[in-house]
């Protein structure tokens, strides 16, 4: 049995997009198994839109898996979200790890 290592990204701590992609490629080269992007549509801290980030990671890498650290399906059209996920998964050769939830009562973006 193997134990995988995943890294979660709750906000966008990088100064530039280039720094982000350098970090993503570093994670892949270092043998990290997966990158997880938190889904926050409203936040005081900078962060990326989850599905756009998944598509970007898919295009910048070839091995590492990636997923959303629970996308709020209550704020998204289910059919469009399913199609976006299917497209990203297909173009990444099955590396997308989708995760969905209804949101949190503790966060304004889920109201």
Language-model region placement:
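Glycine-rich, flexible loop/turn motifs
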Residues: 60, 66, 71, 87, ...
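Conserved beta-strand positions in the central sheet of alpha/beta enzyme cores
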Residues: 36, 67, 97-99
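Flexible, glycine-rich active-site loops centered on histidine and acidic residues
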Residues: 3-15, 75-111
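Residue-level "edge-of-site" marker
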Residues: 40, 70-72, 102
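Active-site nucleophile and cofactor-binding loops and adjacent substrate-binding regions
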Residues: 44, 68-76
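N-terminal beta1-alpha1-beta2 module of alpha/beta enzyme domains
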Residues: 1-61, 65
């Amino acid at each position: 049995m193997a134990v995988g290592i995943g890294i979660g990204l709750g906000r966008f701590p990088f100064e530039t997009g280039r720094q982000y992609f350098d970090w993503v490629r570093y994670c892949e080269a270092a043998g990290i198994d997966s990158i997880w992007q938190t889904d926050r549509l409203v936040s005081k801290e900078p962060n990326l839109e989850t599905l756009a980030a998944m598509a970007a990671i898919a295009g910048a890498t070839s091995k590492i898996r990636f997923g959303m650290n629970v996308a709020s399906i209550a704020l998204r059209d289910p059919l469009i979200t399913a199609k976006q996920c299917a497209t990203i998964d297909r173009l990444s050769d099955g590396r997308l790890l989708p995760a969905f939830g209804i949101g949190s009562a503790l966060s304004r973006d889920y109201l």
